[in-house]
Amino acid sequence: HHMLQTATSRLQNTGAFLSDMVKWGESARIRAVTDDFTGLYNRRFFDDALKDSIQESILNGRPYSLVILDLDRFGTLNAEYGEAVGDSVIQAAVPVFIGVFDESDILSRYGGDEFAFILPGKTGEEALERCRKVCRGLRELEIPALEKGSFDHLSASIGIATCPIHGENTQELLDRADQALYAAKEAGRDRAVLYGMGKMK
């Protein structure tokens, strides 16, 4: 009887221990794929997701749009207001992205003030429409910390490329989204450009 009790309590403890391990594993997994600062996916996860998305797109003939977004003049903003304000600006931008894009979209912080998104099933035109909403949302953000300097609002430049029409591998697609991003900056920033629109370099 005593042995049975010991075995039972040991099993219960083991059960608790295992569920802790599972929880710990889960949070470690989540930590491994997310950017601590914004809660969005990190670059490593994004790169894998992009490869998978391209394969899926080619296999099923569904469009997948890749979006690259840079916050405008972020280096200047950091220099003028300090990095703490720069950080708060990045955190203020994230809810705008989450509000505009769908739950099935993959949103990542790609580096400093650069973000990259994968929009499964969305054509370039549909992606462009969403990205214009992002530009509007960022412009309309009220960030009190910016009022004391030369930035009267936040804005972003956005480049979009769609698989399979603009590229069928990671490098092609990233290059074309980058070219579109460059075109957005050249045209005066605070806008979204779809690869192939207007004057592309």
Residue ranges with predicted function:
Residues 28-48, 69-82, 91:
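Conserved nucleotide-binding and Mg2+-coordinating catalytic segments in signaling enzymes
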Residues 46, 50, 67, 89-90, ...:
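Heptad-repeat coiled-coil signal-transmission/dimerization helices
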Residues 94-95, 126-145, 178:
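Alpha-helical scaffold within the catalytic cores of cyclic-nucleotide enzymes
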Residues 99-104, 136-149, 162, 181-183:
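Short catalytic/binding micro-motifs of nucleotide second-messenger systems
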Residues 106-109:
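A short pre-motif secondary-structure segment
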Residues 120, 128, 132, 148, ...:
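Catalytic-core segments of nucleotide cyclases and related cyclic-nucleotide turnover enzymes
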